Curated annotation (Swiss-Prot):
Keyword rRNA-binding part of the UniProt annotation: yes
Protein name, as recorded: Small ribosomal subunit protein uS13
Positions of the UniProt region annotated as Disordered: 94-118
Keywords recorded for this protein, A-Z: Ribonucleoprotein, Ribosomal protein, RNA-binding, rRNA-binding, tRNA-binding
Gene Ontology cellular-component terms listed: cytosol; small ribosomal subunit
Ranges in coiled-coil conformation: none
Membrane-crossing residue ranges in chain numbering: none
Pfam families: Ribosomal_S13
Length: 118
């Protein structure tokens, strides 16, 4: 297993797919990273040289990934809730934030139904 950004990435997969296993790196960003380092995206991680791995580590370090990104997202949501804006209120109440209908749908966001007692 190769370690990039503190994550063990699978060595038997292609570079782009293996990089996308890091939280915060999708396929398009993984392709951009491979292009910047000069690594073919269809090359497997186990076939990379140490210099190529170091280049990938340096390039990934330029982006917010894993714990830093999770912390940043949670702080953004907390800021919205502290402001008391519409989106913050929706987050606080556990309702859909982006304008979806809630009368008949949104069961995932609202949680299981509360049954009325007789």
């Amino acid at each position: 297993m190769a370690r990039i950004a503190g994550i063990n990435i699978p060595v038997h997969k292609h570079t782009v797919i293996a990089l996308s296993s890091i939280y915060g790196i999708g396929l398009s960003r993984a392709r951009k990273i491979c292009g910047a380092v000069g690594v073919p995206s269809d090359k497997k991680i186990r076939d990379l040289s140490d210099n190529e791995l170091e280049g990938l580590r340096a390039e990934v370090a330029k982006y917010p990934v894993e714990g830093d990104l999770r912390r940043e997202i949670s702080m953004d949501i907390k800021r919205l809730m502290d402001l008391g804006c519409y989106r913050g209120i929706r987050h606080r109440r556990g309702l859909p934030v982006r304008g979806q209908r809630t009368q008949t749908n949104a069961r995932t966001r609202k949680g299981p139904r509360r049954l009325a007692r007789k």
